[in-house]
Amino acid sequence: MIKLIELLKEIGETTEPYPFTLEAIKKRGDSARLVYHFDNKNEDTIKVEIAVDMDSYYYKGPEFTVTFSDMTSSDDEDVKYGTMTNSGDSLKVISTVIACIKDAGKQLLGSIDKVKSINFKGDDKRFKIYLRYAQKQLPSGWSIETREGGNIDLVNSNTQ
């Protein structure tokens, strides 16, 4: 019961993302990579990497592949991207990741509305819950789709 009360309290506190910094933009041909970072309430530095494919094969349009991790976690990719911060602010972290994604859309395309799909890397059951929350943070028209291989994407039905 306490966990539910803590989650409900957190939902009420998560409308504002943490302040974040765009660390780097690297463009090459039809692709780009943006790196952001921010500190959560435990002062863990979270790194957000957005790999951009301007003409995705699967969805035929700009696709963002998003990974985020605690910078103090392991160098092992599987461990790093599966690590929880245990700071009790997961929805605020997701809100900040979405703010980074919106900023990346603005930086590269003028608006998040021009992005066709967003793919989050991660195999944790939490990601489905996080994606539902992320979907609410985006403009209307974004849906959650599962494609072959188990990848879960947010897809923008407003783009052509």
Question: Where are the regions that the model predicts?
Answer:
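Non-catalytic substrate-recognition and accessory regions of acyl/acetyltransferase enzymes
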Residues: 2-160
